[in-house]
């Protein structure tokens, strides 16, 4: 999938799988996301039986194994599903729910219910009862439903199985989808298989929270990395601004390597368009630039609640612009970006070689700047080195304040580990902090990965967290190997061989469990062992979207602390990859 040709309709089943995985896991966690509807165990069981058939226009077609499941979902889950899709994908949809428990049964029912039952009320009738919101509609013909079903069968390689294959029950399909949702991502949460030792009370019936006051954001769970904020349907995002709630000034560790940048960011948040405009932050990957960008947006909105703030990656900006051309909505695109009080664009360097997007961004930049609105940008290099961007863009970037973030010193690295351990409720001895901080100097991401390995190893082996156990956990990712240059092809070749796959199978479109699990591990190892950005890694894996890599990384990180087999595989593969890179 190339970013420029991204299609929600084409990839909707994978989006559904990823979103449902996170919603189900979140609903059973002790600290559920306030933006996601809390659903009961019975409702979670119903959702696991749903198969996404496809998206046609604004109609989502879902498939259930029998009439009872279909009616139960129509009764209790229509509004929650619509709310989640609106929150995560910014889609206002209707639902067409079909039952596939025998064609004869459905055709017999057709005499009494001649049309597919569709939730056709839409956003203007949110106050209606759920039962009343499911009505007959001609929005989707039976031939269209069959067309989507056929596409779903082809996508899953199930042309011989049919829609209601006896070879794969609904429960098996749910488990398969849980493993196969690798194309597009939600965001970080505990895995469904994790059993909470202190389960939360039975959840109350869901009510719409769009206008309710939002509680304070929660911390990320133990062994779970800070969320990457690139996806437009990520867990922990704040409404239309797309600000990640976990990235604030309060949990940003300030040291000599980033002191000036942090101070500049606070100044911009306190006085938008009056202090430094534009503000341009640059530095290598993994040093906290994205964290600072989100923190600016949060603090600015805290001081001025009505402020219109939008965070976007350059890749999302490009996709949004291309979609506006394809859908003939250029004017809508302009309004969305030019009516803001603050526009924050991450990884601006990825606008390189995208001439049309550069042209549009140039005019957007001018419109905002002339209207005295704040612009914040980040890159992996200073403006003068962005030689692939147009001169007129570079000169505008240089017209404000340029600041950088550098590799953190030892004291700052220890402070970062301390804060991460506290947020994860991990008792990390001082000597272990010093060991990790002394060994991993390159980036904050390295520190995070090392901490996760140590805590996962101790949890799985039931060992105390000591310097000795930390040494064992980290022996396969020793910085002594940092002189070895590892590229994605090294990882792909080793992982493919390890799992008895070809490299084409590993990076291809196959969604069988053996392909997906190996692919996710390979993506995780690429993220850990290389310095490439998410979009670059997505390109290395068959041109996938960067959110696919994020999702894979999150899934493997979760498994590391819960599944010793995965932990051992990652350890062994790390050594094999480094040996392969040396050869």
Swiss-Prot record:
Q: Which UniProt keywords apply?
A: ATP-binding, Cytoplasm, DNA replication, DNA-binding, Lipid-binding, Nucleotide-binding
The listed locations are: Cytoplasm
Functional summary from the UniProt entry? Plays an essential role in the initiation and regulation of chromosomal replication. ATP-DnaA binds to the origin of replication (oriC) to initiate formation of the DNA replication initiation complex once per cell cycle. Binds the DnaA box (a 9 base pair repeat at the origin) and separates the double-stranded (ds)DNA. Forms a right-handed helical filament on oriC DNA; dsDNA binds to the exterior of the filament while single-stranded (ss)DNA is stabiized in the filament's interior.
Source organism of the structure = Corynebacterium jeikeium (strain K411)
Which GO molecular function annotation, any one, does this entry have? ATP hydrolysis activity
* The keyword Oxidoreductase appears for this protein: no
Lineage of producing organism: Bacteria, Bacillati, Actinomycetota, Actinomycetes, Mycobacteriales
Feature: compositional bias, Basic and acidic residues: 172-182
Name under which the protein is recorded: Chromosomal replication initiator protein DnaA
Origin superkingdom:
Bacteria
Ranges for region Domain II: 91-241
């Amino acid at each position: 999938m190339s970013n420029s040709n991204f299609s929600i309709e084409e990839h909707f089943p994978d989006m559904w799988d990823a979103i449902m995985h996170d919603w189900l896991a979140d609903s059973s966690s002790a600290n559920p996301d306030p933006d996601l509807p809390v659903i009961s165990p019975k409702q979670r069981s119903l959702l696991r039986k749903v198969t996404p058939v496809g998206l046609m226009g604004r109609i989502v077609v879902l498939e259930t194994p029998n009439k009872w499941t279909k009616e139960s979902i129509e009764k209790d889950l229509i509004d929650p599903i619509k709310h989640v899709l609106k929150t995560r994908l910014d889609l206002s949809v209707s639902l067409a729910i079909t039952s596939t428990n025998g064609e004869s049964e459905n055709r017999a029912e057709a005499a009494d219910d001649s049309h597919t039952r569709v939730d056709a009320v839409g956003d203007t009738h949110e106050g209606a009862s759920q039962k009343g919101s499911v009505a007959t509609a001609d929005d989707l013909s039976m031939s269209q439903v069959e067309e989507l079903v056929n596409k779903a069968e082809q996508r899953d390689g199930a042309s011989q199985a049919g829609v209601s294959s006896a070879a794969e029950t609904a429960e098996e399909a749910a488990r398969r989808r849980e493993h196969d949702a690798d194309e597009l991502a939600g965001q970080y949460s505990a895995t469904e298989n994790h059993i909470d030792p202190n389960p939360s009370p039975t959840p109350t019936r869901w009510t719409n929270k769009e206008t309710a006051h939002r509680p304070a954001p929660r911390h990320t769970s133990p062994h779970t990395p800070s969320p990457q904020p690139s996806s437009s349907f990520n867990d922990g995002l704040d409404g239309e601004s797309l600000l990640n709630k976990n990235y604030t000034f309060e949990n940003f560790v300030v040291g000599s390597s980033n002191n000036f940048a942090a101070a500049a960011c606070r100044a911009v948040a306190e006085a938008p368009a009056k202090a430094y405009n534009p503000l341009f932050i640059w530095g290598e990957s993994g040093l906290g630039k994205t964290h600072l960008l989100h923190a600016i947006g949060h603090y600015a909105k805290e001081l001025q609640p009505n402020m219109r703030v939008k965070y976007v990656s350059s890749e999302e900006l490009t996709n949004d612009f291309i979609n506006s051309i394809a859908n003939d909505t250029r004017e809508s695109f302009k309004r969305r970006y030019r009516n803001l009080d603050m526009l924050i664009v991450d990884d601006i360097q990825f606008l390189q070689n995208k001439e049309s997007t550069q042209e549009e961004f140039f005019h957007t930049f001018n419109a905002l700047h002339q209207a005295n609105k704040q612009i914040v940008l980040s890159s992996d290099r200073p403006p003068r080195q962005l030689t692939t961007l147009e001169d007129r863009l570079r000169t505008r970037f240089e017209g404000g304040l340029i600041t950088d973030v550098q590799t953190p010193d030892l004291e700052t690295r220890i402070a970062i580990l301390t804060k991460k351990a506290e947020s994860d409720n991990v008792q990390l001895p001082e000597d272990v902090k010093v060991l990790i901080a002394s060994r991993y100097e390159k980036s904050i991401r390295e520190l995070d990965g090392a901490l996760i390995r140590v805590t996962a190893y101790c949890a799985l082996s039931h060992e105390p967290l000591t310097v000795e156990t930390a040494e064992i956990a980290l022996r396969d990712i020793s910085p002594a190997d940092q002189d070895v240059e590892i590229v994605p092809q090294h990882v792909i070749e080793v992982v493919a061989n390890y799992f008895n796959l070809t490299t084409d199978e590993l990076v291809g479109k196959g969604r069988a469990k053996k392909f997906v699990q190996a692919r996710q591990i390979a993506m995780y190892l690429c993220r850990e062992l290389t310095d490439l950005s998410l979009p670059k890694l997505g390109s290395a894996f068959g041109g996938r979207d960067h959110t696919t890599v994020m999702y894979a990384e999150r899934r493997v990180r979760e498994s590391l602390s819960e599944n010793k087999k995965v932990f051992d595989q990652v350890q062994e593969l790390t050594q094999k990859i480094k040996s392969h890179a040396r050869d």
